[in-house]
Amino acid sequence: MGYRVAIVGATGEVGRTFLKVLEERNFPVDELVLYASERSEGKVLTFKGKEYTVKALNKENSFKGIDIALFSAGGSTSKEWAPKFAKDGVVVIDNSSAWRMDPDVPLVVPEVNPEDVKDFKKKGIIANPNCSTIQMVVALKPIYDKAGIKRVVVSTYQAVSGAGAKAIEDLKNQTKAWCEGKEMPKAQKFPHQIAFNALPHIDVFFEDGYTKEENKMLYETRKIMHDENIKVSATCVRIPVFYGHSESISMETEKEISPEEAREVLKNAPGVIVIDNPQNNEYPMPIMAEGRDEVFVGRIRKDRVFEPGLSMWVVADNIRKGAATNAVQIAELLVKEGLI
């Protein structure tokens, strides 16, 4: 049995990756409908060798008959249009932050809390977590189940693709100018030069000094893990890498767990690849995660501050597992559980 699938934001980075991932994972698509903004109307995209013309969202659209809609068109579009799709009986899987903290909308990472997917029926919407949260909780969950986790301190090293097409252009243009000895072009996306630099600034700052991105990692983790007591302190940094977010994670556990035990539970965890042989220079890197759907974990060691505790290094492709792949996995889960 196949499904009628819509993609909203089809021409963007994540939207195009939805198409790739649906094809690679052989999701049973019977019909495909592509939506984007008016400026992208009429563009042609390819799926499984067939061309599809992009439509603009407008009030005349009827969404009846569509089974699943994958949204990645920004929060305002999701706020306006996701309920309209849901009203027509469509299950919406939304990649924006618009619905993540809504108590009636499940926030799902299939390797971590698949049981929550059934709760979509309240509003017809399932939220995809933030990219940096997804890879962190996939790596934390096996350790949480084995030893419990009280608190986490995480520093992220996030690729520019997480900030969109203009951010990618900034890094390309600035790097080219620097290499050619030319004047550095004005940044389109970032407040400062990103090439050969690091910006401890992702999303807006709040009065307490934390950013919105850093708060997402706290509140989304609590919701996904069903644990309001877990503490997360994050520092999120944008670095001059095109694809692949990296995270340095230290955690205090409830019970003692050795690095060897942690490696073992992580090796057996779904969606995780352990690469942890630093003596031979083997550890996760963004370049190795690019184009992959797994979360890579390495540098697993006893933490020197938290007792008991562990430290580790976690890397994933932010556009795939951090966005498109996770959404498609949610769709697969809906099919597997017979929920659509």
Curated annotation (Swiss-Prot):
EC code(s) of this entry: 1.2.1.11
Binding-site residues, substrate: 158, 238
Keywords: Amino-acid biosynthesis, Diaminopimelate biosynthesis, Lysine biosynthesis, Methionine biosynthesis, NADP, Oxidoreductase, Threonine biosynthesis
Ligand binding (NADP(+)): 11-14, 39-40, 161-162, 318
MF (Gene Ontology): aspartate-semialdehyde dehydrogenase activity; NAD binding; NADP binding; protein dimerization activity
Reaction(s) this enzyme catalyzes, per UniProt: L-aspartate 4-semialdehyde + phosphate + NADP(+) = 4-phospho-L-aspartate + NADPH + H(+)
Active site: 131, 245
One Pfam family of this chain: Semialdhyde_dhC
Xref: InterPro entries: Asp-semialdehyde_DH_CS, Asp_semialdehyde_DH, Asp_semialdehyde_DH_beta, NAD(P)-bd_dom_sf, Semialdehyde_DH_NAD-bd, Semialdhyde_DH_dimer_dom
Record-listed phosphate binding positions: 100, 216
GO biological process, one term: isoleucine biosynthetic process
Identification of the protein by name: Aspartate-semialdehyde dehydrogenase
Subunit: Homodimer.
Pathway(s) served: Amino-acid biosynthesis; L-lysine biosynthesis via DAP pathway; (S)-tetrahydrodipicolinate from L-aspartate: step 2/4; Amino-acid biosynthesis; L-methionine biosynthesis via de novo pathway; L-homoserine from L-aspartate: step 2/3; Amino-acid biosynthesis; L-threonine biosynthesis; L-threonine from L-aspartate: step 2/5
Family note: Belongs to the aspartate-semialdehyde dehydrogenase family.
Stated role: Catalyzes the NADPH-dependent formation of L-aspartate-semialdehyde (L-ASA) by the reductive dephosphorylation of L-aspartyl-4-phosphate.
